[in-house]
């Protein structure tokens, strides 16, 4: 049986292999294992190696690896002299080399797997971002459709076209004013609404109308008032 004293586990010689294996599996503290193996006799280390190596070849548990590591480091010289351990040590070496080779492949696969996962994560983020943009575009299209259904027509007005229309309106207005002015100055121009209204409404009775002789008499009395006499300078020029 094995006994624990402080930080050291004491193994008895010729102890049962199952008890040794159980004790080693229950302890994985590097400090306790190293102190125990250093204070251990070579024969006990050989017995412990005979028990741990076959178990290690079947299932490489971390606690067994710690025990074998310190046994080989501390008592490796003595173990090479034990003949019945040579085959077990060779098998352990082959197993460790194979495990190291597999570990290299595992690390390589792990790196590739991490790269693939990172790419997949980036691709998923892009898909999420594009889906969000698509939803925003659908919302904008839905709003535009609502505006069209409501009957709101949005017309883009060209400023140059507006200026041309304003110039045409001003030209038409000027032409209209000139035509009205010419019509009003012509001898055949119609009377204003107010004057025509007076002419139509005001009718002189026949009994009050003047005869031709009376009209000539009135003209003789009125015309001299509107005749402007010529200046003495003009009369002198005519006499010359």
Curated annotation (Swiss-Prot):
Major site of localization recorded for this protein: cytoplasm
Region of interest (Disordered), ranges: 125-148, 177-240
Keyword Cell membrane: no
GO CC annotation: cytosol; nucleolus; nucleus
Any one of the GO BP annotations: maturation of SSU-rRNA from tricistronic rRNA transcript (SSU-rRNA, 5.8S rRNA, LSU-rRNA)
Compositional bias segments (type: Basic and acidic residues): 192-203
UniProt subcellular location: Cytoplasm; Nucleus
Coiled-coil intervals: none
Modified residues (Phosphoserine): 231
PANTHER family xrefs: WD REPEAT-CONTAINING PROTEIN 43 (PTHR44267:SF1)
Protein family membership: Belongs to the UTP5 family.
Listed name of the protein: Uncharacterized protein C1450.03
């Amino acid at each position: 049986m094995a006994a624990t004293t402080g930080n050291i586990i004491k193994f008895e010689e010729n102890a049962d292999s199952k008890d040794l294996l159980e004790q080693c599996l229950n302890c994985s503290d590097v400090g306790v294992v190293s102190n125990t193996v250093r204070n251990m006799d070579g024969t006990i280390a050989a017995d412990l190696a005979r028990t741990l190596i076959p178990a290690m070849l079947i299932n490489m548990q971390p606690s067994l690896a710690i025990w074998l590591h310190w046994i080989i480091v501390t008592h490796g010289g003595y173990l090479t002299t034990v003949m019945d351990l040579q085959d077990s040590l060779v098998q352990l070496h082959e197993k460790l080399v194979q495990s190291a080779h597999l570990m290299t492949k595992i690390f390589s696969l792990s790196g590739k797997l991490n790269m693939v996962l990172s790419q997949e994560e980036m691709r998923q983020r892009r898909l999420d971002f594009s889906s969000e943009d698509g939803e925003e575009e659908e919302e904008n299209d839905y709003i535009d459709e609502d505006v069209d259904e409501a009957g709101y027509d949005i017309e883009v007005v060209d400023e140059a076209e507006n200026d041309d229309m304003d110039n045409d309106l001003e030209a038409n207005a000027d032409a209209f004013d000139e035509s009205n002015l010419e019509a009003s100055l012509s001898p055949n121009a119609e009377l204003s609404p107010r004057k025509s209204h007076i002419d139509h409404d005001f009718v002189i009775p026949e009994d009050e109308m003047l005869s031709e002789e009376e009209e000539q008499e009135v003209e003789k009395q009125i015309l001299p008032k509107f005749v402007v006499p010529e200046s003495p300078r003009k009369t002198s020029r005519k006499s010359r």
